[in-house]
Every structure is written in C-alpha cells, then in structure tokens.
C-alpha cells in the first residue's frame, strides 16, 4: 500500500480526534460518542464465462464480453478480501450547546478507476453534519440506499442509482419519519465520442468533458411501519469541449435530468419487497453500471443527406425488483432482477453498451450477529447497440466477520 495513501488516511483520522481534544476543555460536560466498526470478508468467486479481468471481484454486466474470447477462455476463479471495511462514526459536542456535529469516515479495499482490479484503500464516506447542513462525501441525494437488496455481490443490481461523491447538502425539513433535502454535488460527465473517432480521429481524441457547474439534486423521503418511499431528482449541465483547438471548438452542453422513485414494503414481519424505477437523460454516471451521459447524434434529410452532428444527453431507464426473505433468525434469501436500458444515439459505435441485465438468488446463514456466510448465484447479460450480446453465470461464496466498539465519554 503506498505510504502517501496510508498517511492521508491517518491524517484524516487524527484530525477528527484533534477536533475532539480541542473542544474538550471548553465543553467538558458535554457527551462524546464514537463507534469503531467494520468487517473482514473473503469472497470466493467462479465465473462460467469471462468478464473484464479488472472486475473479476464485482459482477457488472457492462464488463461482460460480447465477443467470444475477448478476455480469454471461459472459466475464471478469484478469491478477494476487497469488500472488507473499516469505519469510525460518532458525534462531537459544540460550544454553547447548539447541537452536535455528527461525522462518519469509512473505507473499504475495493480499487476502482485507475486502481481497478487492485486491493487498495477506497474512500466510501467522509462527511460531517451539523444541524441542517452536511459537507463531505456520502451517498448522492439522487440515490435510494434503502432499495439495496440483501445480496453479497459487491456491486449489486445494475439498474440502481448508486453513487457516493463530495457534496454540500441542506435539509430544511426533517421529522422522525420524513425529510426533504437539496444539494450541490460534484459533476462528473461521461462522454462517448462514438463514430466521430472514425471520420475525424483527431477530433475524437481531443473531445473531453466540460464541468462548469455542480449537479443539483433533491430528495423527499418518508417511512412508516409499512416501509418507505423516496423520490429523488437531479438537474445537471452535461458539457464538452476540445483540447488544442481554437477557442476549444467544437464545444457545447446539454441539460441532463432524472427522476428516481424507490420504495420497499414490509411483509411477513421481516421480509421486504423492493422496487426502484429511474429514468432520465444524461444520468449514466450516477448509475450502478453501464451507459454514457453524452454522445454524438446525426441529423439527416429524408434523402439521407447529413445535415449536422450535435451532442445529445443519452436517455436511460433503470429498474430494480427484489424480494428479501427471512426464513428465520439465522437463514435468509434474496432473489430479484434488474436492468439498465440505454436509448443509443445513431452515431455511437455498434459495440456501444445498450442494455445490461442482472439477476441473482442467494442463501445466507447468520448464526450470530457478527458472523455471516453463504452462497449466491448470479446471471448477467450485456447487449450492445448492434444487438450482439454476451452473458455470464457467477457463483460466489462469502464469509464475513464483523466487529464494533462503542465509546462514550
């Protein structure tokens, strides 16, 4: 593990406790609450076909090959500890008794981005909240974490909105059962140059994302003994420009937007029926898997003559349907299906991602609160714009040991 990365983590943790110490003298009578928690998990995985080797430890339909042999011959085994997690959360008192600062810092070992395929520190949460204001990295308001089913695959259903990112959040309305929040979140556009790479390779190579404005998100949530309902919304500027050209032309932007409705219903005492539907344009970067935010679109005359090429915010639909069944205190099963459907533009490559499907069933054994083991079977399929598809069946067996300690001062 790189020394600089370890140093950053230790500095962040020490900063939290430094604040604690600094405040201690002024507000010695106040209560401090900390929880240290986490788990060690090992996942044994076998694929009957092949996925992108950088993603052997997470089941993502977008990483399934649609051309036989792309990632080698069929069959692959992996054993991973990347899901293992460590976190610290708690509350710090504030002078003049104006309410606590609640904080959370959490990491796992699942490398993504430039670290994809590696077992390395990955920041999940790093935020603090005082009153109505939250600052830091956590789940997007566009996301509904309560629709995440009881699965052991790290990545989970493809059709979910699932994104953690830096943000500034305001919650003007909050009760014991409901809240309404708005936020500005870090922009991150995913642009597909498509067939522009073929008829103008230089332009295709020089196109880049342009992120001049933050993303604007909002969320309304309510719950009861029956379950919960959440509606999330997003409005964003999805822009592009060119590197090394006069005035960075061509350049431009489109408006991205989306609505995400999620809910679960409590049935048979402990069971849950889970559902989520999301639709929008230019929202793929917020999805759990697959798609692109912006792609080129050509306009033709009825005679087939090209009039112009312009950018288009790509439409996308995501669906999740799962059932969490608790047979008794020790045994449980989660079964369900999810999809992501993209409405490709006419200038995306034939091999561009069009649809991802994901289905799974498991049987989990929890003999004690901090021990879990079980197996899961997953099926996934990727379909490209040219309707060529590839599929994979995965078997996973996992063992997880959890730990935690509460400290009150």
Predicted regions and their residues:
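Sequence/structural signature of outer-membrane beta-barrel proteins
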Residues: 47, 93-95, 110-114, 140-144, ...
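Cleavable N-terminal export/targeting peptides
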Residues: 1-28, 407-409
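Transmembrane beta-barrel architecture of outer membranes
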Residues: 123-125, 165-167, 213-217, 254-262, ...
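Outer-membrane beta-barrel "beta-signal"
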Residues: 390-409
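Outer membrane beta-barrel
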Residues: 27-56, 62-192, 210-228, 264-268, ...
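Detector for outer-membrane/organellar transmembrane beta-barrel domains
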Residues: 223-353, 409
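C-terminal closing repeat unit and adjoining cap/tail of repeat-based domains
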Residues: 359-376
